[in-house]
Amino acid sequence: MEEILKSFKISIDNEGYSKSFSLEDLDNFNNNNNNNNNNNNNEENNPYEFFERYGFLVIRNVISEEDCNKTVGEIFDIIESKVKTFDRNDQSTWDQTFSEDGSSIPQYGSPSKPPIFKKQFLMNRTNPNVYKVFSKLLKNQDLMVNHDRACFFRPTLVNPKWKTNDNVHLDMNPYNWMGNGDICREELSKLTYARLGEFIVENNQPTQNDGLQLQGVINLLDNQELDGGYCVTPGFHTIFNEYFTSKKPQYTSPSWNFDKKDIAFKYAKRISMRKGSIVVWNQQMPHGSMSNKSFNPRMAQFIKIFPTSTVNSVRYQHRKNQIKSIIENSDELKDFPLNQISSQLLGLN
């Protein structure tokens, strides 16, 4: 297994960013796995063959610069609302960035532990380009979007104490995923969304019976390798079953963390991306983040889009009621533009 992971190399373009594709590339090629002939030249040009082989895909220019800037502003709004001494324009005030009341996750750079419901965050979740990326890879247009967190990595060359924890993990229990799905369905059936944290819980209950499941990160600033951020273990999806059948099963945790000595951690690669890019990966892929080692901050929004067919009618209604209530009771969301795509993705149909 180690030799397989060791064989994967990620090319870097002439601006120092990891291999990426355009939205047009998604249209210019067909997503037909039967045409995969393992030709490395095709993988470099065809986004679907690249995704099939590597297990992840970077698409550039998905979110506009203006929308990225608005999202960055909303992240700073969250921080400044919690930490009164923090000033986004003065790095000397960044020593205390994360609130001490348990509503942040400082070790991973998350200013908000609950999912974020701000206008631009919802605009990004329902952005037609984002929807296009997921629908093309899933070969499915009947999709819904999750509600997740964001991250802010401070520049550690300004202050080494701002370092976040390196981590590689799965947002699922691999043994429940490989099972018949009963455990996952039971957990999902308990969700009423009375607590906002239940929107996070739903992310971690995929099953192989649901087919391909995708996660993503929307990159909000130019992000070079030393700026820290997203990492993934290319090709791991090809050895997923073999790897976990060689381990002692454990069914209780909703996620799986890899030790630094593990091959999944050892062969994880930092994926550098331009502002406005999105990286999407097969949920079977070990992924996580590496800490910042530069003068530049990192900001990103987390996202998952999944087939509506994986949500039963009772849970759909609970979810719909909560989303509708959140929008109607928020001054900044009352005028949120609902159309065919956004209503479908938010589960408001």
Curated annotation (Swiss-Prot):
Keywords, ordered alphabetically: Dioxygenase, Iron, Metal-binding, Oxidoreductase
Keyword Iron attached: yes
Residues at which 2-oxoglutarate binds: K118, H169, L170, D171
Binding site for Fe cation: H169, D171
A GO biological-process term: fatty acid metabolic process
Coiled-coil segments on the chain, per record: none
Pathway per the UniProt entry: Lipid metabolism; fatty acid metabolism
Keyword Oxidoreductase: yes
A Pfam family it matches: PhyH
Cofactor: Fe cation; L-ascorbate
Gene Ontology MF annotations: metal ion binding; phytanoyl-CoA dioxygenase activity
InterPro entries to which the protein is assigned, alphabetical: Phytyl_CoA_dOase-like
Similarity comment: Belongs to the PhyH family.
PANTHER family, A to Z: PHYTANOYL-COA DIOXYGENASE-RELATED, PHYTANOYL-COA DIOXYGENASE-RELATED-RELATED
Protein's job: Converts phytanoyl-CoA to 2-hydroxyphytanoyl-CoA.
Record's protein name: Putative phytanoyl-CoA dioxygenase
